[in-house]
Amino acid sequence: SFVPPIKGYDLRGVFTLRTIEDAHEISTYANNTDNVVLIGGGLLGIETGYALRKSGKKVTVVESFPRLLPRQLDVDGAFRLQQILEEMGFHFRLSAKTLEIIGDNQTTTGVILEGGEVL
C-alpha cells in the first residue's frame, strides 16, 4: 500500500497494512494503547478500525478526501457509511492532511494535522 511521505512515519507504533503479519503486529501493539489514528479512509483502514473499535479502542480516521471510500461510494453512500461508523464510536477528520507523526523515545505519541490539531 502507498505510504505518504509524512515525517515520523518510521516511529514505533506506525504501521502499514499489507500482509497478515502486518495485521498481527497491529493487533499486538494495539493491546498496549487506547487511541488509534488511521491515516486514510479506505476499505482496509475502515475494516481495521472496526476490529479495533470492537476491542474498545478510540479510533480516529484521517482522510484527505471530503468523504470515505471516494472511489467506491457516491456522496450519499459515503455519508451514510460515516453515520453508521460514528454510531459505532468512530471519529473522523475529513478533508484533512496529516503533517507529522510525533513521538518521544522513538514511540508515537500523536499526529499533527494541517491547521495544527493534534490527535
What kind of feature is each model-predicted range?
Residues 25-73, 108:
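Rossmann-like NAD(P)H-binding beta-loop-alpha module
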Residues 18-21, 43, 96:
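Short beta->alpha linker loops
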Residues 1-37, 110-118:
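FAD-binding core/adjacent interface of flavoenzyme oxidoreductases
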Residues 15-18, 36-39, 60, 81-85:
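Short, surface-exposed linear patches
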Residues 21, 47, 80:
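Short Gly/charged-rich anion-binding patches and loops
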Residues 3-6, 48-49, 71, 103:
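Short glycine-/acidic-enriched loop or helix-start segments at secondary-structure transitions
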Residues 12-15, 46-48, 89:
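Short acidic/polar alpha-helix capping motifs at helix-coil junctions
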